[in-house]
Structure formats: structure tokens, C-alpha cells
């Protein structure tokens, strides 16, 4: 498995079997990703999108076979305009926008995506990639298990700064339930996790750690450090440095809205 970093730091994963390859995520849709990936493998490439956000999905139409959970179609379409991508790049490169030509940007094509289903298995020849639903960050968020390698690619589903505060995110309570479900479903099948931001590898305990962070939020014991993002006020559950490394030495974190802790907004 090969990790690929994008212009703005997101991490994609190329999984190669004996016959086929899977690319997990495609970042911003600028700079001809397919041309680069084809220097790494000569095998037919299938794309699995972990979710529909601008920094993960916009490069997908360069490829012929793309799978995404349709619950994220509206997110993908909303983030497809060129100005959305340029704004994201500028925000993540200190206000500087590289001198890209207009034809360096991939045109959106969600109508060509295939449905990515919970439990779907891709046979690559000697290796398999399994997609499993883990809604929370978005309603269509998926994780990818490579069982032969005992690796679980978590993407943005569960990491050191899981965003749970925008209109497309689930409540902390619902997210916790989904974490528990995936933890039980995949118990014993992976020994390490891979992320799509900041660091590549994390421990097999990442899901459990984030469940515990959710527990602290739901019991009023979180640190609740104010966090501002694109006009939205949210809170970082556990104190962390500028690289989202927890100050207590723990692993995993969430950034959430006080209005989205409970299902239906009602505390238990």
C-alpha cells in the first residue's frame, strides 16, 4: 500500500493486488492525479471515496470507475464549483494560490459515480478492499479495510481532529453509536489504522479512544477548547497543540457543536 500526499496535505492510499488496484480518495481535483497514479501502477484503478468533501472527492472524475456512498452526493455537488476549491487551497496554503490553469481543474461528474455500499468487497487479486459505513463526519462516510494487511483506513471518519460540527454531520451521540457498531463488526480484523490528515499511521485503538472522547463530551467532562472555522463556532473536546496532538498524550479527538451532542437535540 502506498500513501500519497496532496498539495494541501491530505493523504490518499493506493492499494495494489495482483490484478487490480484501488485508490482511496482523490483530493482536490487539480493537477492531474490520474497521470501521477499511473506512474505507480499499471493495473486497472478503481476509486473508493471515503466521503464527498472537497479535499477528498473532487479528483475522482479523472478516473473511469468511481464508488461513493450516495448519501454524500449533495455535499459533493455543493463543493464542486471552482471557487470552492480555490478557496480551500488558499486557506490551506497561507492565502497563496498556485498558478494553475483552468484546465488543470477536474470537472465534476457525480452522475457517473457508482453506489458504494456498506460491506462491499473489491477483489484485487490476492488482496481485498472492504468498504464499511461509519456515518458521523458526514452521513455517507465510509472506512476501508484491507484484511490481508490488517489495516483499516479511517480517512476522516475517526482521527485526531474529527469534524462533527457542520450541517452534514451527525450528533455526537449518533456518531458514538456508529463507532461502537464498526468496532464490534471489525473486531480482531485490523492491527493498525491509517488516516487522511496530519499523520499516516495510528494505532488499532483509535476507534476506542474516540468513543471515550464522545463519552466525555456526553457527560460534560470534555475540555471544550473554542474552535472557529469558516464562521462556525465549535469546540475541541480534548486540549491539543497546533498539529492536533493531544496534550494529555492520548489519541483521537473530535471537534463538535454544542447544538449537536444529542439525537434530536435532547439530552438523555
Could you describe each region identified by the protein language model?
Residues 15, 25, 37, 51, ...:
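Divalent metal-coordination and catalytic microenvironments
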Residues 135-167, 172-173, 180-183:
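Active-site-proximal loop/helix segments of hydrolase catalytic cores
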Residues 118-146:
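Core dinuclear metal-dependent hydrolase active-site scaffold
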Residues 120, 180-268:
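Accessory terminal helices/loops
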Residues 1-39, 144-159:
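Conserved beta-strand hairpin/beta-sheet module of binuclear metal-dependent hydrolase folds
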Residues 30-123, 160, 212-221:
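Active-site HxH/HxHxD metal-binding segment of metal-dependent hydrolases
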Amino acid at each position: 500500500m502506498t500513501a500519497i500526499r496532496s498539495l494541501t496535505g491530505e493523504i490518499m492510499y493506493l492499494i495494489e493486488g495482483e490484478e487490480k488496484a484501488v485508490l482511496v480518495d482523490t483530493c482536490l481535483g487539480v493537477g492531474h492525479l490520474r497521470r501521477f497514479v499511473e506512474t505507480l501502477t499499471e493495473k486497472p484503478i478503481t476509486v473508493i471515496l471515503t466521503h464527498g468533501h472537497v479535499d477528498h472527492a473532487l479528483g475522482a472524475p479523472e478516473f473511469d470507475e468511481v464508488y461513493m456512498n450516495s448519501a454524500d452526493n449533495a455535499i459533493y455537488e455543493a463543493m464542486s464549483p471552482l471557487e470552492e476549491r480555490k478557496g480551500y487551497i488558499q486557506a490551506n496554503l497561507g492565502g497563496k494560490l498556485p498558478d494553475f490553469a483552468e484546465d488543470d481543474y477536474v470537472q465534476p461528474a457525480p452522475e457517473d459515480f457508482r453506489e458504494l455500499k456498506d460491506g462491499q468487497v473489491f477483489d484485487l487479486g490476492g488482496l481485498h478492499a472492504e468498504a464499511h459505513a461509519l456515518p458521523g463526519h458526514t452521513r455517507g462516510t465510509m472506512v476501508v479495510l484491507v484484511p490481508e494487511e490488517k489495516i483499516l483506513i479511517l480517512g476522516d471518519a475517526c482521527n485526531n481532529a474529527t469534524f462533527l460540527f457542520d450541517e452534514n454531520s451527525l450528533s455526537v451521540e449518533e456518531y458514538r453509536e456508529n463507532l461502537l457498531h464498526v468496532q464490534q463488526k471489525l473486531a480482531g480484523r485490523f492491527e493498525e489504522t491509517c488516516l487522511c490528515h496530519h499523520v499516516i499511521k495510528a494505532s488499532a485503538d483509535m476507534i476506542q479512544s474516540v468513543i471515550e472522547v464522545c463519552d466525555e463530551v456526553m457527560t460534560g467532562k470534555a475540555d471544550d477548547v473554542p474552535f472557529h472555522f469558516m464562521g462556525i463556532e465549535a469546540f475541541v473536546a480534548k486540549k491539543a497543540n497546533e498539529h492536533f496532538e493531544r496534550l494529555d498524550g492520548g489519541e483521537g479527538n473530535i471537534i463538535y457543536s454544542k447544538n449537536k451532542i444529542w439525537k434530536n437535540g435532547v439530552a438523555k
